[in-house]
């Protein structure tokens, strides 16, 4: 589960620490895994609070896409959500996972940990805003 916090044409990305075992030293959307019994939105809300200390405002999410990334035992199914409203200013609350957070204009996103996610994100945001 990953979330694209979106405001005024920009998306918040997290830079994965160079010490991370999986996908080190790359930009990514914040998020993580679902716990047993959690819905996608519950997992998204929990992960964004744990990593950024934000609280998603009810009704402010739109599903962007699902895609498979990686191979073999590293394969994961990503579900990406657009979040357009939240409480509290995002802060790096997980410095052991991310060494930086930064807003990027949608048209200038850097390469993401999962390459297809960046393409899907730009397409989905364009469709969402149309």
Question: Which positions does each model-derived feature cover?
Answer:
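Conserved N-terminal beta-strand and adjoining loop/helix that marks the start
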Residues: 1-12
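Short secondary-structure boundary/capping segments
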Residues: 3-4, 19, 72, 92-95
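Short connector loops at helix/strand junctions that flank enzyme active sites
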Residues: 6, 24, 58, 73-78
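Active-site-adjacent beta-strand/loop module that shapes the phosphate/pyrophosphate-binding cleft
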Residues: 9, 65-90, 102, 124
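Conserved Nudix-box catalytic region and its N-terminal flanking loop in Nudix hydrolases
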Residues: 10-50
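A short coil-to-beta-strand element that immediately follows conserved catalytic motifs
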Residues: 55-65
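NUDIX/MutT-family hydrolases
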Residues: 82, 91-125
């Amino acid at each position: 589960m990953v979330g694209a916090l979106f405001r005024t044409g920009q998306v918040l990305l997290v830079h994965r620490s160079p010490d991370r075992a999986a996908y080190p030293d790359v930009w990514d959307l914040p998020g993580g895994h679902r716990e047993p019994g959690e819905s996608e939105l519950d997992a998204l809300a929990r992960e964004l609070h744990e990593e950024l200390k934000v609280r998603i405002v009810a009704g402010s999410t739109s599903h962007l896409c699902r895609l498979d990334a990686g191979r073999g035992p590293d394969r994961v199914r990503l579900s990406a959500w657009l979040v357009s409203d939240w409480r509290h200013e995002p802060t790096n609350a997980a410095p052991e996972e991310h060494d930086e957070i930064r807003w990027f204009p949608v048209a200038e996103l850097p390469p993401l940990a999962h390459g297809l996610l960046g393409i899907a994100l730009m397409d989905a945001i364009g469709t969402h805003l149309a």
